[in-house]
Design a protein with these regions (language model features):
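Terminal alpha-helical segments
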Residues: 1-97
Length: 97
């Protein structure tokens, strides 16, 4: 599926919504993701499970920031999956490598 088709389908299904690109909100998410990564690293030797959970949150926040910059946001009850799908379809082949 092409990126364009993915966007069309997810908008039609109500999984994505268009919005004005938001640099300020994206920046806040990136700064929070940086803190999350620092926290994950600090906790790795203490509790590996927590470290991975916090690292996952960093990935999610970073990807949501990217979506905001592209003029989209996830909606409905599948937000985590929608964010991952968005990045997969945007990055395409590069993500697989």
């Amino acid at each position: 599926m092409t990126y364009k088709k993915f966007i069309e389908d997810y908008l039609a299904e109500g999984l994505l919504k268009r919005q004005k690109p938001d640099l300020k909100s994206a920046e806040k998410l990136i700064l929070r993701a940086q803190k999350d990564l620092q926290t994950a690293k600090a906790n790795l030797s203490i509790d590996e499970g927590i470290a991975y959970t916090v690292a996952y949150l960093a990935m999610l926040r970073s990807a949501r920031a990217f979506m905001l910059l592209k003029g989209f946001r996830p909606s409905d009850g599948y937000q985590h999956q929608t964010v991952v799908d968005f990045m997969f379809h945007f990055l395409g082949k590069e993500l697989k490598e």
